[in-house]
């Protein structure tokens, strides 16, 4: 089931509360942490999503988890509201939507850089600087390795992909040879 539209509404509401109270970064971190806890534990999901378990028991469990994690009242109340409305399964998407809103608010773009092998920190810093200059936004870089690229780098920012991999160049070269 897709929770994207529900998650957008909850994400927007949490974002606005965070902006109004000056706690946006903390709320985003807490919602992300709550999402990670929910996603990581199948047992927790089974208990929290089970309609046969009394609502009071589920809420008690959420209060205890929120207390142990030192979540703010806003985060704890959000989790309780999601539980009452049977929408806890939307929590990972809510966290994602909230992170997108925070990035947009702070003019941050997330770049995924994929290379065949490891890249030095210096190279990633230079790449980040060039991407920031090209986009006019602050860039957060995540590096991944994919040996199938052979050599080169593939960079993805939002929906834009810059493919400088040897695999793509060889594939393009092969296609050109076959056409002639």
Curated annotation (Swiss-Prot):
GO terms for cellular component: plasma membrane; proton-transporting ATP synthase complex. It is found in: Cell inner membrane. Gene3D superfamilies: N-terminal domain of the delta subunit of the F1F0-ATP synthase. Disulfide bonds: none annotated. It is a peripheral membrane protein. Keywords: ATP synthesis, Cell inner membrane, Cell membrane, CF(1), Hydrogen ion transport, Ion transport, Membrane, Transport. It holds the Pfam family OSCP. GO terms for molecular function: proton-transporting ATP synthase activity, rotational mechanism. F-type ATPases have 2 components, F(1) - the catalytic core - and F(0) - the membrane proton channel. F(1) has five subunits: alpha(3), beta(3), gamma(1), delta(1), epsilon(1). F(0) has three main subunits: a(1), b(2) and c(10-14). The alpha and beta chains form an alternating ring which encloses part of the gamma chain. F(1) is attached to F(0) by a central stalk formed by the gamma and epsilon chains, while a peripheral stalk is formed by the delta and b chains. NCBIfam families: ATP_synt_delta. F(1)F(0) ATP synthase produces ATP from ADP in the presence of a proton or sodium gradient. F-type ATPases consist of two structural domains, F(1) containing the extramembraneous catalytic core and F(0) containing the membrane proton channel, linked together by a central stalk and a peripheral stalk. During catalysis, ATP synthesis in the catalytic domain of F(1) is coupled via a rotary mechanism of the central stalk subunits to proton translocation. Belongs to the ATPase delta chain family. This is ATP synthase subunit delta. It comes from Sorangium cellulosum (strain So ce56) (Polyangium cellulosum (strain So ce56)).
């Amino acid at each position: 089931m897709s929770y994207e539209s529900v998650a957008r509404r909850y994400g927007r509401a949490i974002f606005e509360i965070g902006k109004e109270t000056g706690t946006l970064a903390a709320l985003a971190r807490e919602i992300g942490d709550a999402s990670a806890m929910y996603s990581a534990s199948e047992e927790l999901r089974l208990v929290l999503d089970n309609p046969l378990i009394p609502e009071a028991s589920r809420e008690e469990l959420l209060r205890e988890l929120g207390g142990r994690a030192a979540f703010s009242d806003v985060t704890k109340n959000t989790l309780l509201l999601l539980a009452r409305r049977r929408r806890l399964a939307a929590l990972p998407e809510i966290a994602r939507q909230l992170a997108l809103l925070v990035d947009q608010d702070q003019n941050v773009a997330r770049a995924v850089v994929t290379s065949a092998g490891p890249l030095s920190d210096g190279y990633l810093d230079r790449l980040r600087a060039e991407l920031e200059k090209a986009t006019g936004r602050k860039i957060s870089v995540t590096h991944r390795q994919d040996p199938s690229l052979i050599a080169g780098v593939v960079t993805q920012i939002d929906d834009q992909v810059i493919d400088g991999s040897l695999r793509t160049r060889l594939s393009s070269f092969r296609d050109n040879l076959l056409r002639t």
